[in-house]
Amino acid sequence: MNLCCGCFVRPLFLYERSFNMYTLKTNASFDSAHFLAGYEGKCSNIHGHHWTVEIEVGSNSLEMGGNNRGMIVDFSRLKTDLKNIADALDHCLIVEIGSLKRRTLDVLEEEHFKVVEVMFRPTAENFAKFFYEEMKQKGYHVLKATVYETPNNCAAYME
């Protein structure tokens, strides 16, 4: 042990872990358009992405009985819950509340365009936090949510 500022500090070795955990990952995708209000650059214009969302959940233990014995959760339930959230954003224009004039929104509605207003600037980073929180509200122990706006560019959120 090392003495530092009057306290004992235990050296941390890379092979030491304080817990064991099982993890599951699944993904869903959706296509949508967005723009970044107030951004100086190309992303201030309406443009689209094929978004992919990857969610990772974990547990220190597995189900001990029933249909899910030996599992954290059934993959089909995890995939369905994530897909339902992604499907609500599929083939729409995602806008930050207050970023478009009311009359613009009214015209889009009259033309039967699907517009989804969100409380955040629609960046990959904010979508990662959004999916993390939505899945957490469904009762999952979410470890990490990753959102790809292109195959090579992604943002992640974890707590």
Protein language model features and the residues they cover:
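Charge-rich, low-complexity N-terminal segments
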Residues: 17-159
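Secreted/luminal cysteine- and crosslink-motif detector
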Residues: 5-8, 44
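Short, Lys/Arg-enriched N-terminal segments with co-localized hydrophobic residues
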Residues: 7-20
